[in-house]
Swiss-Prot record:
Recorded family membership: Belongs to the eukaryotic/archaeal RNase P protein component 2 family.
Domain of life the protein comes from: Eukaryota
Protein name: Probable ribonuclease P/MRP protein subunit POP5
Subunit comment: Component of nuclear RNase P and RNase MRP ribonucleoproteins. Interacts with GAF1/RPP30.
Disruption-associated phenotype: Defective embryo arrested at the globular stage.
InterPro entries hit by this protein: Pop5/Rpp14/Rnp2-like, RNase_P/MRP_POP5, Rnp2-like_sf
Length: 151
């Protein structure tokens, strides 16, 4: 039996620093659903229905941390460049302008998970003093979720 060959992309979401938030805090809560929708919309706009159909076979947003804004996206090996390009061309999630930065690309979930865990811990150490108790609880939940991440 032959397994599917996938690529896992670790990326970071930057909210647009030029947009004035007027004290609203974070304008959007990053979820698997809204990130997946933004990437699928980008694939549809840039590659058409055929490109979207070929990419959807194994496309999945595997992990999203709403505090550190790190995400893991899975795609097939054959279509990962197309998904990568579509990720690069995403300009907004909802009505919030964003920039998506690819940090790592890997052939197995374990290597990507380890890199994401390292990045999450470093970011958490940097911002832990300014987080509320609820955000710290949410961060710890995300760290536990990524440790359990497998196929």
């Amino acid at each position: 039996m032959v397994g599917f060959k996938n690529r896992y992309m670790l990326m970071e979401v930057f909210l647009d620093p030029d947009k004035d938030l007027l004290g609203e805090g974070t304008p959007i809560i990053l979820t698997q659903f809204n990130l997946s929708k933004a990437i699928k919309d980008s694939i549809l706009v840039n590659f058409g229905e055929c490109g979207l159909g070929s990419s959807l076979g194994s496309f999945q947003v595997k992990y999203v941390n709403p505090i550190t804004k790190l995400c893991i996206v899975r795609s097939s090996r054959e279509e990962h460049r197309q998904v990568w390009l579509a990720i690069t061309l995403v300009k907004s999630i909802g009505n919030c302008p964003v920039i998506l930065n690819l940090l790592d690309i890997s052939g197995c979930i374990r290597a990507c998970r380890d890199t994401a865990l390292k990045c999450d811990k470093e970011k958490f150490e940097q911002c832990s003093k300014s987080l509320s108790e609820e955000e710290i609880r949410q961060m710890n939940t995300s760290l536990e979720k990524i440790k359990l991440l497998e196929n």
